[in-house]
Structures are given as C-alpha cells and as structure tokens.
A protein has these predicted regions:
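Conserved C-terminal guanine-recognition region of P-loop GTPase G domains, centered on the G4
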Residues: 189-197, 210-258
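Hydrophobic positions on the alpha1 helix immediately C-terminal to the Walker A/P-loop
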Residues: 101
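Hydrophobic anchor at the beta1->P-loop junction of P-loop NTPases
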Residues: 88-90
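Long, well-ordered amphipathic alpha-helical subdomains in the mid-to-C-terminal portions
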Residues: 53-55, 268, 279-352
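Nucleotide-state-sensitive switch-loop elements of NTP-binding domains
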Residues: 37-85, 96, 105-191, 198-205, ...
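P-loop (Walker A) phosphate-binding loop of NTP-binding proteins
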Residues: 93
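Canonical P-loop GTPase G-domain recognition
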Residues: 234-288
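Non-catalytic terminal/linker segments enriched in charged/polar, low-complexity residues
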Residues: 3-80, 330-331, 347-352
Length: 352
C-alpha cells in the first residue's frame, strides 16, 4: 500500500503499537507525502490519536514561515478544546531519578484510567541528542502504554523558544484528551523558571546526601516548588532520605511560598519500588482542590496566558528589529568586537 493510501485504520495501528519517538520521525516522513491539512490534524488530535498529535506538535515546532501560518490556525481552532488537564512541572538534580519517578507516577495514573502526557524540556540539548532522549529510552514501559504520550521538546538556543513551543505542545496534549501533562526539565539553567510559568504545580525531586540543599536555595529553585520529594528512599538509603525530608521541611517553613495560600511540603518516596508515589499524587490533588476553591488556580492560569503573550511579543519585536537592521547590527557588532566603539554607544546608535 502506498503512503498516500494509508488510511485511518493503519494510523490507529501505528498509534497503538509504535513508540511516539518513532511516530515523530514517521510523521515527518508522511508529512512530505500526505501533507495532512489543519482540518485533518484537528480531527485526529481531538480523537486522541497520538500519530496526529505528534504531527501537530511537529508543525507548531517548525520555524518555517509557511508552517507558522498553519500553526497559528491550528492553535486558534484547537483552543476551545484546551484547559482540562492538570499541568505538573517537575525538575531535579542530576541523578535524582526523574525518569524513574515519571514512569512510576505515569504508570500509576494510567492504571487509574488517566491519560498522561510527558513533555521533556532541556535548553542545553536539541531534539536529536542529549539527556532528553536518554531519559525517554529509560521510560520504555510508559512510552508503550496506550494511555501515555512522551515527547521531547527541542529548544534551540532560546529559552523563550522553549516556552513558546512547550506551551503549544501542552495545549495540544490537552486537546487530545490527556488528563495530566507532566513537563520535565533537567534541573540546570533557567528552564525551571520557564516551566514554572506554564504549570499549575511545580515539584522538585531531590536525593539525600547530594549536598544540594544550600545550592538549591542559591539557584532559587526551592522557592519555586510547591513540593519537594526526596527520591530513592529505599534500602540502606531510606534513613538518610527520611532525614533529608525533615531538613527540607524545615527549610520550606522559612521560605516564602510561590503559591499564595499554600504551604509547600516535603515528602519521600522510592520510585524504583513504587513506594510513596500515591502520597505524592494525593498532595498534588489536594493542591488543585484547595487552589481551585480559593480562586488561585484560575487566576494563575490567566496570569500565565498574559505572561506568555508578553514573552512572545518581546520575542517577535526583537526578531523583526534584528531582521530589518541586520547589516547595521553586523557593522556595529564588528566595531564593538574590534574595540572601536563602546557597547553603550553602539546601542545608542541602534536605539536613539
């Protein structure tokens, strides 16, 4: 059967049995042949077909002008179908067991009949390499589950780009009917702040004895967290993990909560053994219920939409200004590099 004759039944088979990473490359292949239109993508996404969801995300990630027009149309029409998922951001120090934790939590939620999407964000990596794809291959069981979808989110060299593309991917996952969207960041750089601005609940995963308590405070990551979970609380490490949980609880009591009306808590778990995962999720649900009742939940989402608008506005203005003044900027850049013009004077010439 030729690619152009590939029907809905075949797509459903692929959707069920093929890992989403394969679907990504598959979708790129057939997009050159079949070129599904926006109507087809919307129908497929809203029907919960992972193959169409992967193609839709690939479209919104594209920087090609012809694709951006289609992406804008797609997002505009998909918007009424979004907003129904619980958005959870997750970060942690290297070696904290993020992949194991996400898989344990995801499999637990899938067992409850929930649909779970995982978006992995790494500003230091591209979609073709780095720790994202390594994490993804360690979540094989979750990636194969019919109720799960795992997608690395490329970043290029711009944190603003990370925010824009990941937000759009998140909305597409909601339109596809996913109940929970987990947005993972590797725990380095400024990506935690970016992910915090697009999620409802932000979870910091730690391990005992890593010496990261004060380092975390310096980075400002702990202040962003709605909960700290000490992972690997098993075997000989269980006592150290419990002591670390007590220490983090003490630290949290002295810090200002990022979420008004919520006192962040510290928990412990063993993602490897599956112990404590249910307690973590129960805390997330408690947060959702309390913040919904107080109005903080809805207010935060409105504020996040406005913040997103301003971030994209700044990015668009900067891009348009750079494109329209490319030669002038290059000349001043060369002069600054040679030490002929002070940086402040170069800026004043560009922005009189």
């Amino acid at each position: 059967m030729g690619w152009q004759r590939l029907g809905a039944a075949a797509l459903q088979v692929i959707d069920r049995y093929v890992d989403d990473g394969v679907i990504m490359s598959f979708s790129r292949h057939i997009s050159r042949r079949r070129k599904p239109d926006v109507d087809t993508l919307i129908r497929g996404v809203c029907a919960g077909q992972r193959s169409h969801l992967a193609m839709a995300i690939t479209l919104v990630e594209s920087r090609a002008p012809k694709h951006r027009r289609l992406a804008h149309e797609l997002m505009q029409r998909i918007l009424p179908h979004t907003g129904g998922a619980l958005r959870v951001g997750l970060t942690g120090v290297p070696g904290a067991g993020k992949s194991t934790f996400i898989e344990a939590l995801g499999m637990s939620l899938c067992a409850q009949g929930k649909k779970v999407a995982v978006l992995a964000v790494d500003p230091s990596s591209s979609i073709h390499g780095g720790s994202i794809l390594g994490d993804k291959t360690r979540m094989e069981d979750l990636a194969r589950h019919a109720n799960a979808f795992i997608r690395p989110s490329p970043s290029g060299n711009s944190l603003g780009g990370v925010t824009a593309r990941t937000r759009e991917a998140l909305l597409l996952c909601e339109a596809a009917g996913y109940d929970v969207v987990l947005v993972e960041t590797v725990g380095v750089g400024q990506s935690e702040t970016e992910v915090r601005t697009m999620t409802d609940f932000f979870l910091l995963l730690q391990i005992a004895g890593a010496g990261d308590e004060l380092q975390g405070i310096k980075k400002g990551v702990i202040e962003l967290a709605d909960a700290i979970v000490v992972n690997k609380a098993d075997g000989d490490n269980q006592r150290k993990a419990e002591l670390a949980k007590v220490e983090y609880s003490r630290i949290l009591n002295f810090l200002h909560s990022f979420t008004p009306g919520w006192q962040p808590q510290a928990l412990s778990c063993s993602a490897l053994e599956g112990d404590g995962i249910d307690h973590v999720w129960a805390l997330v649900l408690k947060f959702r219920d309390e913040m919904t009742a107080s109005g903080v939940f809805e207010r935060r989402r409105r504020e996040q939409n406005v913040d997103w608008f301003h971030a994209l506005l700044q990015q668009a203005v900067m891009q348009r200004f750079t494109e329209s003044n490319r030669e002038r900027i290059q000349a001043l850049e060369d002069a600054v590099g040679r030490g002929e013009v002070p940086v402040s004077m170069a800026l004043s010439e560009l922005l009189p």
